[in-house]
Amino acid sequence: MDIKRAKQEIKDAIEAYLVKDECGKYMIPAIHQRPILLMGPPGIGKTQIMEQVARECGIGLVAYTITHHTRQSAVGLPFIQKKQYGGKEYSVTEYTMSEIIASVYDKMEVTGHKEGILFIDEINCVSETLAPTMLQFLQCKTFGNQKVPEGWIIVAAGNPPEYNKSVREFDVVTLDRIKKIDVEENFDVWKEYAYQVSVHPAVISYLDARRENFYRMETTVDGRMFATARGWEDLSRLIQVYERLGKKVDREVVHQYIQHWKIAKDFANYLELYVKYRKDYGIEKILEGTYGEDTLEKLKVAAFDEKLSVVNLLSGRLAGAFKDTYEMDRYVSALYEWLKKYRALIREVEKEGMSEELYASGGIIKTIYFRAKKEFEDQKKAEKLDRDGERCMAKVVDTLEGYWNYAKEEHLAGNEAFEQIRELFADETEKREEMIDHTMEMLEHAFEFLEKAFGESQEMVVFVTELNTNYYSIWFLKENDCGLYYKYNKGLLFDERHQEILKQMDEAEESMERGIR
């Protein structure tokens, strides 16, 4: 199955494992909570989905790459203990707590999560000395003489033998005690993820055109050559920073991430053309609606690959605008929720009678600011926020601090302070509306340009399909009406339905012919 389905399977299993009955006991006892084993090629996102699942389920996560550990750190260090058996004293070997189990308890203390995921990566690549320990871990849920705390689910990941020479096969006894999920690479699923994490548009469009290069693992006389999803994402981050610094990404740089020389050269050439077309066609001018007729004429006579590159350039630029608009909306909505709490606190204080501290300049907004700051710190400590969520909440806290400072400097309190802060918040909502309007104008200009250049062609289908793939464009189009999008999307859906009907008719005809024969 693909990584998206695997994530859902893991999430469903964890939710089932953590359901309790009316007595507060787990409905599936720990002994029957099978460890989950993810088996799949390296670099397809096994570790990332564990972070996402933990965050979405609101539980903790402790992750270890077991190949980085010795038997002593996994099991614990031995020490001699005196014990009485049958009236005689004996020296017995005991073990200190496993470093891994100790990390689980540390995580529980720091985050407050009593339930979570213990994720062990590369579990089938351990050394000979650790192999029996790993079997014991999967079968008995213990490291040495220490059990994994109740409420913590074991998830392990490994690579099939064809990807790693040091792989050890699990025996049937072990496999019969685990929930095994085989994961395969899938570009369409990765593409959805790529849009969400803002992978560089050149990487997405290149892989969309050359899907066979998304994941490749080959053994040659010169050694192993490979391209992985992890490599493409990390290369994307580098390209984005290099563009900001004005540095060039050539084939040598690409090969440092995509360690398949043929693919690295091919992508480097594609990236060079991508940058050239962005400059030659003036993508920003197209989206502003200020392009010249010469741009249209040039595109009309261009080769299909060049036309497709321009469509991808427009999609890529719009993808950034959609995400910026989404983040602005998320920030303003979060700020609005805190200002509602601010208004509620003012009413509560008025009803109960103001204290001197709250009556002082900016006293109430100061209270709201510190509450927001504490909630932000608690969420970070509990690892409940992803990178975008953390950035959004940090901006909200900074804005609330600015409101407090403003009220303090202007000696504002109570309703007077609220009215002034409400005006400041109106500026933020106005900025959001301006950003939405600007993004809509860009989208409409893109449609108008493509309409003039291609009409209802294959290029327009590609453009609309990209809009239907991107998480942020889907959100934007749900929240804001775009007539041109609905026009062409309706045509696309009709064509797809028409093709589906023709296919069904062909299948029915073939079935009838087989029946006659």
Regions flagged by a language model, labelled:
Residues 1-212, 217:
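AAA+ P-loop NTPase catalytic core and its hallmark functional loops
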Residues 2-9, 36, 171, 186-189, ...:
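General structural signal for secondary-structure boundaries
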Residues 6, 97-105, 299, 501, ...:
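Extended hydrophobic/Leu-rich segments
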Residues 8, 12, 16, 55, ...:
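Charged/polar, solvent-exposed surface patches and flexible loops
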Residues 196-359:
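Alpha-helical lid/collar subdomain of P-loop NTPases
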Residues 300-517:
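Terminal-proximal interaction/regulatory segments of ATP-powered molecular machines
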